Amino acid sequence: MKALFRSLAVLVATASFAFAGTEGWVTNWEEAKAKAKAENKPILINLTGSDWCGWCIKLHKEVFSQKAFTEYAAANLVLMEADYPRKTELSPELKKQNAALKKDYLNEGYPTVLLLDAEGKKLSEEIGYREGGPEAYVKHIQELLAKTAKK
């Protein structure tokens, strides 16, 4: 029984960290804005429930962790994750920051993916999971950015 409990604890801990520290993603809002300014890139912010939201988990697994997306994002976006987990405790600072981001940007539900300029001005908003995989997701982002560039 103890071995089963230990195995389950390891599995939960591993799953909890599957999203945290994902390569290329920052979790600090000020860092994301500074990086966006320095690199002259828009911010893609993912408001997610990484350990409880099925659509968020699917989006991460099928899009955000795939090579087609990560390569495009590395060259063209600043990636930020604002997580609202139920099983993982965030630091008080991160909780406070994410609560403010939720108040400012979350209107309907998870996942919410926003494209923002370096000042935090909303360029576009996507609520829920978008079918089609990483290539289609990248194409959609490119189209959204092209539309905002024309404005």
Q: Locations of the language-model features?
A:
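Short pre-active-site segment immediately N-terminal to redox-active cysteine/selenocysteine motifs
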Residues: 40, 48-52, 109
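Hydrophobic beta-strand anchors of alpha/beta hydrolase catalytic cores
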Residues: 44-45, 53, 79, 113
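Conserved redox-active cysteine motifs that mediate thiol-disulfide chemistry
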Residues: 48-64
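Sec-dependent signal peptide recognition
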Residues: 2-10
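Non-catalytic, surface beta->alpha helical segment in thiol-disulfide oxidoreductase systems
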Residues: 62, 104, 108-149
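A short beta-strand-turn-helix
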Residues: 26-43, 73
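Boundary at the C-terminal end of the N-terminal hydrophobic targeting segment
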Residues: 18-20
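Thiol-based oxidoreductase modules, predominantly thioredoxin-like and allied folds used
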Residues: 23-26, 66-96
